[in-house]
Structures are given as structure tokens and as C-alpha cells.
């Protein structure tokens, strides 16, 4: 009887600690910096003053990547490539097992999505609106000067601004102010 009570007590303690331990697990998905040309600054979050980025550094939720004039960077998240052009600021607002949310503050990114699952999980925001990818393809997003331009090389996307939402197919482009 005493052994049973002790066992129940230990199980109750473990049940209390298990949810906390599960929450502490890092996400299974991270990005990797795979190409760096020129000075690129990496900040782990908005409070981080930043450091020079290095190849193969992991990118997690909250990370901010800034490219200097004449620099570029490439980040892979599983089978998806995100290429940053010169003078670009990109924040990974969400990067977990279910979603990748990119916030492009300025500059240009090219996004290559290789499968439907990746396309459904990734979306991008700019100061002017949101871009949702409808399927695999190659996309370019440029933002600055109060305007965002979205070009679809292959695939299709939906671009949503303040007062409209438009589909953009392969070989097409859309602008939002």
C-alpha cells in the first residue's frame, strides 16, 4: 500500500514536470545561412546589437538579417531558398514546425519554393501588405520607398494590400502602395 502511494506520488510529480519539459523543446525547423557575400549582420532578436554573420549559422524565430550595400545572403529552410539582395532587412518573425513568417522591412528577396507544403507554410509581410504563395515556384519581392513589387517567375501568389487582394501568376507582377 505504501509502495503504491509512493508510485502515485512520483507519477504525479512527473506529470507536472512533463508539460514544462515539452514546452522547452526547440522547434524542429531552423534555417541555415548558406551563402554570404560581403558584410552581413545577424541579430538573434530586436534587442540584440548584432554580429557579423557566418556561413552555416542557424536561423531561428526572431532572427534579423541585414545585408550591407553590395552584399547578399542566402538562407535555406528545409527545401526552400531565401536570397537577400543588397541593403535588405529580413526578419524571421515565425520559424517553427508549422509556419515561416518573413517580414521584409526593406530591400529585395527571392524565394524559391520546391513543394506545395513549403508554399502553404511560408508567407511574407512588407510595410505595404502580405504575400501568400499558392504553390511551388520562384518569387521576388522588392520593397522600399513606400511601395512593394512582387514578381512571379514561376508558380502563383496572392498579394494583399490595404484595399485590395490580387492573384499573381507566372510571368506576372503586382505592386502595392
Give the residues covered by each predicted segment.
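Bacterial N-terminal signal peptides
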Residues: 8-17
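Flexible, surface-exposed loop/linker segments and immediately adjacent secondary-structure boundaries
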Residues: 22-176
